[in-house]
Regions:
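Hydrophobic residues at beta-strand termini and immediately following loops
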Residues: 28, 76, 127
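Small-molecule kinase domains that catalyze NTP-dependent phosphoryl transfer to phosphate-bearing small molecules
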Residues: 61-64, 92-139
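ATP-dependent NMP and nucleoside kinases share a basic, alpha-helical "lid"
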Residues: 32-90
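Conserved nucleotide-sensing/catalytic segment adjacent to the nucleotide-binding pocket
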Residues: 1-33
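Short, flexible loop segments at the rims of nucleotide/cofactor-binding pockets, characterized by
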Residues: 26-31, 51-53, 103-106
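Short, basic, glycine/proline-bearing loop/turn elements
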Residues: 22-23, 48, 97-101
Length: 139
């Protein structure tokens, strides 16, 4: 797994404890398919920090350590067909041909979604995204 879970945990620790200056978090640039360090400032006056990630409910020990740094973890549930539609559209928007986007979703994203769904019941709250009445998202 190329994700730096230990660095993520260190960032969350700093965001919780450092009050004298901003703490900077990375963003992910989908245009270049790379994280961009220091893109998101968490200001000292911030009292609520929202983070997102597929593995926040993972039973893996490194991810359990991350979960221990969070007050709550919510699972956002979306119907499978809508998730697939959004993922395919996102991959197409960032340069994949339609067939390649569908193949990627089927071989990578959907198996990942199945693993993540297995941890659903460990969430503090399950949010049914469709019930929120929001307009359909781009991704």
């Amino acid at each position: 797994d190329p994700f730096d879970v230990d660095g993520y945990a260190a960032l969350l620790r700093r965001a919780r404890t450092v009050r004298a200056r901003a703490v900077y978090a990375p963003d992910f640039d989908r245009e270049v398919h790379q994280p961009v360090a220091g893109s998101i400032p968490v200001l000292p006056e911030a009292r609520l920090v929202i983070t997102e990630g597929n593995y926040l409910l993972s039973p893996d020990p490194a991810w359990r350590a991350v979960r221990g740094l969070l007050d709550e973890v919510w699972y956002c549930e979306l119907a499978s067909d809508e998730r697939v539609r959004r993922l395919v559209a996102r991959h197409e928007r960032f340069g994949k041909a339609a067939d390649a986007a569908r193949a990627w979703v089927a071989s990578v994203d959907e198996p990942n979604a199945a693993a993540i769904a297995a941890w659903r019941d460990t969430a503090d709250l399950v949010v049914d995204v469709a019930s929120l009445g929001l307009p359909a998202g781009r991704d």
